[in-house]
Amino acid sequence: SPPCGECKFCVDHTSPNLCVTLQFGSMTIPHFSEGNAPVHAMAGTGTFAEKTLLPKQAVVKIDPDIPLDIASLIGCGVMTGAGAALNTAKVTPGSSVIIYGAGGVGVAAIQGARIAGAAEIVAVDLNDAKLDDARRFGATHAVKPEDVDGAKLEITGGDGFDYALECIGNPLTMRASFDAVRRGGTACI
């Protein structure tokens, strides 16, 4: 569910991700019924349904010529990764960014960091093919996890990166993100 647009977090336009309705209402408020019995959606989203009913705030009209398999990528992975760089972390021009994970969300985060004007973008992944993709998408450096400390020393003089974006969802890379940023840096988990 999208943010409600009415609570204090939504109204100030700075923290719609903290919307209480979004966090709790989408999972607990039944939107459908069969007879008198409430019907809940899987995780509040109807993920495995062939059709679902959505509030207008959750819908974006697309050109009918855009294939749905392409449009669906933009609506999830691309917006999550690029949004982490542009909207959540607010990467600044000339900054240094380390991105853990070079899958779909990670390469979108790389693109977001590029758009924001980051000078140094380090992608971290275990998979060589994904590191190659990261370079193609704009990473200035692509390293394996064991090479992060060397990249940190080379790029930041050991002080740490301005931003770390964790795009895997693994507790180890979450911790590594905090360790990778400089004092006062931003880790986006």
Regions flagged by a language model, labelled:
Residues V181-R183:
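Helix-to-beta-strand junctions that scaffold the AdoMet/dcAdoMet cofactor pocket
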